[in-house]
Amino acid sequence: WVDNINLKGNNNLVNINAGFDETSFILKNKFQSSNLQVFDFYDQTRHTEQAIKRARKVSRVYPGTKSISTGKIPLKDSSIDILFLLSAAHEVRSNEERELLFNECSRVLKKQGKILVVEHLRDLPNFLAFSVGFMHFFSKKTWKSVFDKANIKLEEEIKFTPFMSVFVLEKINKK
């Protein structure tokens, strides 16, 4: 699905996860000449879902992964070309904390940069697949509200399966 997105400037990449990282090795292979920085926002006192605790036990850690808080990404303003949040942002259960995370993502993103968020949605296909487990996910409306509050616009939504959405986001550059 990454091949179908117009990604200009892929020198400085960030992949942010909740400690369950299935994607950094794949991203580095895809963008071999890039500078990929990987951050893990997992905080056992705030992110208490049992599924993420189990997943962390079996996940490989990408070399150089740094632990961060959702409220502070240790990067300069406007320094990142592409920021990935791949099946991770829904682990931030608090609306306020999720807004802090996306405000930080917006802050570090270059003017023409992209944020790619991959998530299940709280919708009919996911209800049919996960039954009440779909309550772990957020609706498109909830995501859109978070993006709006972080000064990020939804450029495109791509359904790469009936169950998964890719949100292609851009920073709204104030004049």
PLM region descriptions:
Residues 81-96:
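A short SAM/SAH-binding and catalytic strip from SAM-dependent methyltransferases
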Residues 6-7, 31, 109:
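A generic alpha-to-beta junction signature in SAM-dependent methyltransferases
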Residues 96-114:
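A short glycine-rich, Lys/Arg-flanked "PGG" loop and its adjoining helix->strand segment in the class I
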Residues 1-10:
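Conserved alpha-helix/loop element of class I SAM-dependent methyltransferases that forms part
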Residues 168-175:
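C-terminal lobe and adjacent flexible extensions of AdoMet/dcAdoMet transferase-like proteins
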Residues 68-83:
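A short acidic, Gly/Pro-enriched loop at the edge of an enzyme's catalytic core
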Residues 114-168:
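C-terminal alpha-helical "lid/dimerization" subdomain adjacent to the S-adenosyl-L-methionine
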Residues 12-15, 19-72:
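Class I SAM-dependent methyltransferase SAM/SAH-binding core
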